[in-house]
A protein has these predicted regions:
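Hydrophobic pocket-lining residues that define ligand/cofactor binding sites across diverse proteins
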Residues: 105, 166, 201, 232, ...
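A short beta-to-alpha transition loop/helix N-cap that caps and shapes the active-site region
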Residues: 36-38, 123-125, 185, 251, ...
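NAD(P)-dependent short-chain dehydrogenase/reductase
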Residues: 127-134, 152, 160-217, 222-226, ...
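Pocket-edge positions in alpha/beta enzyme catalytic cores
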Residues: 50, 61, 82, 90, ...
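Gly/Ser/Thr-rich beta-alpha loop segments that engage phosphate groups in nucleotides
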Residues: 9-12, 38, 120, 185, ...
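N-terminal Rossmann-like NAD(P)+-binding domain of SDR-like oxidoreductases, especially those catalyzing
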Residues: 1-174, 339
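C-terminal substrate-binding subdomain of Rossmann-fold SDR/epimerase-dehydratase oxidoreductases
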Residues: 204-339
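Residue-level recognition of beta-strand->loop/alpha-helix junctions
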Residues: 31, 177-180, 272
């Protein structure tokens, strides 16, 4: 098949590009390189330096006639911009850009549209949380949606537009709601705290963990995400699916896993660690994906951290410390400041 992947120079997109090529598909990558890396793109793919908001994208689809479009292009908050400008950027990329891609799919008679969405920031807190003090909540794809951040709001809106194009124009789709994705990557592409912790500890520097959040999140290894995307090339028609580990871990858990794997005694610097009166551990139920196409995550947090550390050391020429056993009893959750 011929597959067009938007955002193919980013962390998830570059891994998918390689996997599609390894599976024998013809792949074209569309990316602005604003946040992605040209070096991350597999040289076997054809690269188009293009913004998804550009009208030329529709001409490209008309010319290339991809069978499948895998939409992984997304905005990223920029520290130099005020909050309202970042919110406008999210809307511009995730709504206007998405509509441009969807229109191009319809005009080019694309057979399927795969939409990379989110999950951890989408769902409404149940009322029982406030009464119980702490709730470990497993949510499925039908749970009430209540996104609070502009990024998540625009992604939820994007899902609505994808479904609209299916109803209105018959464009088949699969929506994948990812947990927080981690894996081996270039540092400049890193957005997950695991990569931050690994790089800081290997450089014998003290990581900074700041914030006042107390909820755990679901984390999924990039290898498991790639396998799910390969599955939905031919399955999961018009479904919305969690691609998740089915487990929740707080940021302190992540740090302890990395520190133990690296045999490091360095402690993080906690800035303003204020916990609220309630503590939620959100877990994304992945039963629907398991049933739809037999997918299941293969790496838990311990195995995933070990794999990422090994790959990171290989990439940067560091020696792996002796093997250690991961163990954590921490129940605190802090936000990483340097993401």
């Amino acid at each position: 098949m011929k597959i067009a992947i938007t955002g193919g120079a980013g962390f998830i997109g570059s891994h998918l590009t390689k996997a599609y090529l390894d599976a024998g598909h013809d792949v074209l990558v569309v990316d602005t390189l604003r946040h992605g890396s040209l070096e991350a793109i597999d040289p076997r793919a054809r690269f188009y330096h293009m913004d998804i908001r550009d009208g030329a994208l529709q001409s490209l689809f008309q010319r290339e006639r991809p069978d499948i479009v895998s939409h992984h292009a997304a905005s990223r908050p920029e520290a130099r911009l005020p909050l309202e400008e970042n919110a406008l950027l999210d809307a511009d990329v995730h709504v206007r850009g998405l509509l441009n891609v969807l229109e191009g799919c319809v005009e080019a008679s694309v057979s399927k549209f795969i939409f990379a969405s989110g999950g951890n920031g989408f769902y409404e807190r149940p009322e029982t949380m406030e009464r119980a003090g702490k709730v470990d909540s497993v949510v499925d794809e039908d749970a009430p949606l209540r996104p609070l951040k502009p990024y998540d709001i625009t992604k939820v809106a994007g899902e609505g537009y994808v479904r609209y194009f299916t109803r209105q124009y018959g464009l088949p789709h699969t929506i994948l709601r990812y947990a927080d994705v981690y894996g081996e990557m270039d540092v400049k592409l890193a957005q997950h705290p695991l990569t931050y912790f690994i790089s800081m500890l290997l450089e014998q520097r003290r990581p900074i963990i700041r914030g006042a959040a107390d909820e755990a999140r679901d984390h999924i290894c990039i290898d498991d995400v790639v396998r799910a995307n390969l599955c939905v090339l031919t399955r999961g028609q018009n479904q919305t699916l969690h691609i998740s580990s089915g487990e929740s871990h707080n940021v302190s858990d992540l740090f302890r896993a990395v520190a133990t794997c690296l045999c490091s005694e360095i402690e993080p610097l906690y800035l303003s660690p204020v916990l609220s009166s309630t503590s939620a551990a959100w877990t994304l139920d992945n039963t629907r994906a398991r049933v739809a196409f037999g997918w299941r995550p293969e790496r838990d947090l311990v195995a995933g951290v070990q794999w990422v550390v090994e790959r990171f050391c290989e990439r940067h020429g560091w020696d792996m410390p002796v093997e250690a056993v991961y163990n954590t009893s921490s129940n605190e959750r802090y936000l990483v400041g340097a993401r």
